[in-house]
């Protein structure tokens, strides 16, 4: 596959019209220390306990704190509202709660609030978005001292700190109960968080305004954010976002496609930044024969041929672009445990043809490749596969259709991506896709499933690394996947906005500031 993709004419036209008709104004909020950011998708709640959207995660990191947080530099899980923690044994975790943390209503955070929060999540009737996940590993929580809480786990679970950091913001005791609570936990009203910003105004599906919380605890790594007010405007159409950025209506666009970023970043009043993302693209092959017991993909040499046939380097360089890189194994290179030393499959179409012949398919065969995103990349894959004699029918469908067919185990091959929830740990990628019983697992490899499960049932670092290496090598040896590439994130900013690009694709806006220039 050799291609240099031209910028689509539609995007050229949009930029030409926008540049010609809209004045390039001062930033939306520099003069009054306000930051205005475009959200592509609406939020119906500001409560992270009832939202799984990426936008909800971004907002929650401003308005909420959990006991732990993701260090933006190391991507490791470290204490936040927790002062310290200790593993008493593999299934008992004790956490000391800080004594200088205040809710936005002025009340002080207590151990009772932490117990209340997790008991609410453990209550099946609360219907929290991550409740089933937490309930799968957490048996109970209890107050063990004036500022100490004890977590009693059902089993050893190394990602407990991750779940607390990403999914469970601390709530004040009684938030969801009684006359002072909320009858509908996800209804359109602000919540009482402990983050560096508090909700000032929330119009569901339209706009969220937050303001700096001056009584935020100084020991936090999020303390003293520079920007006083932030506004998140819901603007689903990227063309409209471009117009707003150029006219000064917003200060930032996120998740900008490379061709759009190429096209308008050279205009005055626009700055471009590129960063990494934990998301990876991959192709799954039906090695188990779920879709058809006679599918050629049950043969190892066929799967190896597919791996050699796809020019991942050029797809990554010319189509994904930015900071994207080819990934050799079934995980993101920045994730803990993503250290395989098994076989890799360099682009070699002639070897791919030989392998097909050895597998009994000298003239190739026909199959459907399913996809739901990045059609141009899926088309490039199809082009490469046709070069080795395969008759590939690209079935490009919407995500809901794709998910149903995939979950029904009725795909011979599919191209997809996975963001691991922004988690820098192989359990969120390798573990999700190759666990026994996973709808994403098309291997029927019981030993592999046991290996990834074992890696999620020990808190010993060295043992986890060994188990993930074993799993990744097995996946590579059997060519169950075609690991493709990591993704690159593009951001378009107003001049003068200082914004550290995140390593995991999840912006930390408390780090943003306006320069004096």
Residue ranges and their predicted role:
Residues 71-72, 165-225, 229-231, 349-350, ...:
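Gly/Pro-rich hinge or "lid" segments in bacterial periplasmic/extracellular proteins
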Residues 83-127, 144, 150-152, 244, ...:
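Aromatic- and charge-enriched surface segment that lines or borders ligand/interaction sites
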Residues 38-88, 119, 192-194:
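N-terminal lobe/hinge region of extracytoplasmic solute-binding protein
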Residues 185, 215-263, 391-393:
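Ligand-site clamp/hinge motif
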Residues 43, 203, 207, 276-281, ...:
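Detector for C-terminal structural segments
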Residues 196-197, 292-293, 325-358, 376:
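Structural transition elements
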Residues 4, 10, 86, 132-176, ...:
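Surface-exposed binding/hinge segments that line
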Residues 41-57, 80-81, 107, 130, ...:
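A structural "hinge/loop" feature
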